[in-house]
Design a protein with these regions (language model features):
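The alpha-helix within a helix-turn-helix
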Residues: 15, 26, 55
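DNA major-groove recognition helix of helix-turn-helix/homeodomain DNA-binding modules
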Residues: 49-64
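A short, Lys/Arg-rich alpha-helix, primarily the initiator
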Residues: 1-17
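Short, charged recognition helix plus adjacent turn
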Residues: 1-2, 67-69
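Short, conserved catalytic or interaction motifs in soluble domains
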Residues: 41
Length: 69
């Protein structure tokens, strides 16, 4: 069995619930807007530290924001 786990996310939905733009969220967590966009579209997998900071900023548990597909 050679299946690759892909980390998916609900970042865009959680950000919208909080009424935050990509720019505002990026400022809150200390990364570029492009990084937020890349995470939302699955082009970039955040580090454990960034994933935790995103969870805190969006008031979500890790498993509410990220999941394996």
């Amino acid at each position: 069995m050679n299946q690759e786990l892909v980390l998916e996310n609900h970042l865009k939905e959680a950000r919208a619930e909080k009424g935050l733009s990509q720019q505002k969220l990026s400022e809150l967590v200390g990364v570029s807007r492009n990084t937020i966009s890349s995470i939302e579209t699955g082009q970039f997998c955040p580090t454990a530290k960034l994933a935790l900071v995103l969870c805190i900023a969006l008031d979500k548990k890790f498993e509410e924001l990220f999941f394996f597909e």
